[in-house]
Amino acid sequence: MERFKKASSIIETLKQQGHEAYFVGGSVRDLIIDRPIGDIDIATSALPEEVMAIFPRNVPVGLEHGTVIVVENGEPYEVTTFRTESEYEDFRRPSSVQFVRSLEEDLKRRDFTMNAIAMTEEGKMVDLFAGQEAIQQREIVTVGNAADRFQEDALRMMRGIRFVSTLGFSLEMKTKQAIETYGHLLEHIAIERITVEFEKLLTGTYCVKGLKELVETKLFSHLPYLQMSEERLLKATQYKWDSFETDIEAWAFFLYCIGEEHPSVFLRQWKFSNKKIKDIVAVLLTIRTRKEKDWDTVLLYKTGIHIAEMAERVYEAMIERYDPTSVERVQSMFHALPIQERQEMNVTGNDLLNWANKKPGPWVAEMLQKIEEAIVQGNVVNEKERIREWLQGCNLL
């Protein structure tokens, strides 16, 4: 409750000015579940311009949606006016937002009952839709009619399955049936928004449970490159997913599990950045080599510690060994390398030109590569004169 206490002065100030105000959303849910608290959000009957007048230190980030960031005690908090939404367009966004003075009207537009609980600054719960009961039953239940909620915003179906993965809850029967019925509406949603939810699914503590729900509801059949992947997705549920430390590892393992032969094409369809695609593909390529042989100095040096650590964790999951010392061994080997990157070499192309008395050309880069490999393999000490002597001894100068 300590973090809520820091923000409670905002609620107290709003109430002193004659407005209602409550803590709402995921932070209240996580407090009840006893999970780490994320961002703390506040809902109020005050209109955005009233909030801005009361709190001079503010950032009007989303006035059309009624949201103002208020800075209090050095911390930013989202303060949003109670609102209701009109008909939705394209199954993803409301055609208009109306500000209201009713907490109930605000809460009833939310996706799931566990996310529709408000809390006073004293810690009293305002639970109009049995959200606490759903949490106690470990169930994900829509607020009101599931069909209506999913037709308003089809992304809520992915959010529901994401919560299965992150919380370990189960989909309530009618909620699950509605996902099966309206799953096709997900095709109206921008893939970038789906990717965010799917990544949270893959990195959730209960990822296997989430993937099973993805299959059982048939929602996977409306996702890019997964339309015919039921058996491959079920294969992915046979592994443990709790040893990964990054989203890169989770995606690499997922692509391995489903046997994706063209990972770059798959990831581009999911709108990943070039950097992220490069890292995921690098992990997959490293695993392919790792399956054939153990780490050696050259492989580790060329791979780099960042990719090597991730690849080793994924490899451990693949062979179902889960030995934490394997990554420690990789780290020890890497730190014992004579050099860890080319910039650490104590010789340059100019040195080679001076020693050989030859014109510049491709031979310089080729020679530097040979020296680099020799240093990494321990065949020559990384000192300028020792390198020159080694080159002369190998008749390379």
UniProtKB/Swiss-Prot annotation:
The keyword Transmembrane helix does not apply. Keywords: ATP-binding, Magnesium, Metal-binding, Nucleotide-binding, Nucleotidyltransferase, RNA repair, RNA-binding, Transferase, tRNA processing. One of its GO terms (molecular function) is magnesium ion binding. It catalyses: a tRNA precursor + 2 CTP + ATP = a tRNA with a 3' CCA end + 3 diphosphate; a tRNA with a 3' CCA end + 2 CTP + ATP = a tRNA with a 3' CCACCA end + 3 diphosphate. Its EC number is 2.7.7.72. SUPFAM superfamilies: Nucleotidyltransferase, Poly A polymerase C-terminal region-like. GO terms for biological process: RNA repair; tRNA 3'-terminal CCA addition; tRNA processing. It comes from the Bacteria. A single active site specifically recognizes both ATP and CTP and is responsible for their addition. It comes from Bacillus cereus (strain ATCC 14579 / DSM 31 / CCUG 7414 / JCM 2152 / NBRC 15305 / NCIMB 9373 / NCTC 2599 / NRRL B-3711). Homodimer. Disulfide bonds: none annotated. ATP binds at residues 26, 29, 110, 153, 156, 159, 162. Belongs to the tRNA nucleotidyltransferase/poly(A) polymerase family. Bacterial CCA-adding enzyme type 3 subfamily. This is CCA-adding enzyme. Catalyzes the addition and repair of the essential 3'-terminal CCA sequence in tRNAs without using a nucleic acid template. Adds these three nucleotides in the order of C, C, and A to the tRNA nucleotide-73, using CTP and ATP as substrates and producing inorganic pyrophosphate. tRNA 3'-terminal CCA addition is required both for tRNA processing and repair. Also involved in tRNA surveillance by mediating tandem CCA addition to generate a CCACCA at the 3' terminus of unstable tRNAs. While stable tRNAs receive only 3'-terminal CCA, unstable tRNAs are marked with CCACCA and rapidly degraded. NCBIfam families: PRK13299.1. Pfam families: PolyA_pol, PolyA_pol_RNAbd, tRNA_NucTran2_2. The gene is cca. Mg(2+) binds at residues 39, 41. Its cofactor is Mg(2+).
